[in-house]
Amino acid sequence: PVVALVVAAGSGSRLGAGLPKALVELGGVSLVRRSVSAMIEGGAKKVVVTIPSGTEAEFAAALSGLPGVSCVVGGPQRQDSVRLGLKALARMCPASSVVLVHDAARPLVPPSVVRRVASAVLEGAVAVIPVVPVHDTIREVGETDSQVVDRDRLRAVQTPQGFRLGALLAAHEEAAAQG
């Protein structure tokens, strides 16, 4: 099966909205609901959302009515939140499941991208990371000068990123064990 982990455990302090960024609304719908809906429309049968501690009621309300969705409290860093979310998925899904890791702060991902990432993993890819061309001018800054970087060689990394659940969880457990 295809399952998803939506990372929404950030506090959103840089945004200055006074609530977690994932709960901010875009067109009357929270970012987290838009992101989870895209995962479901793209084929995810189960979705785990990592959330900040103490926000369980707010996230339950934001995600009300969406099928196959559960929330777990994330950790202090994104990597911790991903590991905790993967552990939750591993308790309910086989290790061979395709897991799509997605940032709640990217609510406009088309379900077609979700399906393409999942399909590539199902067809044998070990890891699938969608990228888009960089359109902005980028400068590499040194001590006393700077130069334009050839943007034709650059790509911006997007989510969801696809893997096999067991392999990604094992990598995260190893990283956590090594500190």
Where are these regions (language model features)?
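Structural beta-sheet core signal
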Residues: A4-V6, V49, V101, A127-P130
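Residue-level signal for inorganic ion chemistry
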Residues: V6, V32, G85, H102-D103, ...
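Acidic metal-phosphate-binding loop of nucleotide-sugar-dependent transferases
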Residues: R78, A104-L108
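Short, high-confidence coil segments that cap the C-terminus of an alpha-helix
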Residues: A44, P94-S96, G124-A127
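N-terminal glycine-rich phosphate-binding loop and ensuing alpha1 helix
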Residues: P1-E56, G68
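Short phosphate-binding loop-to-helix
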Residues: L63-V98
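Conserved core of the sugar-phosphate nucleotidyltransferase
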Residues: V109-G179
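Acidic helix N-cap motif at the loop->helix transition within catalytic regions
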Residues: E56-A62
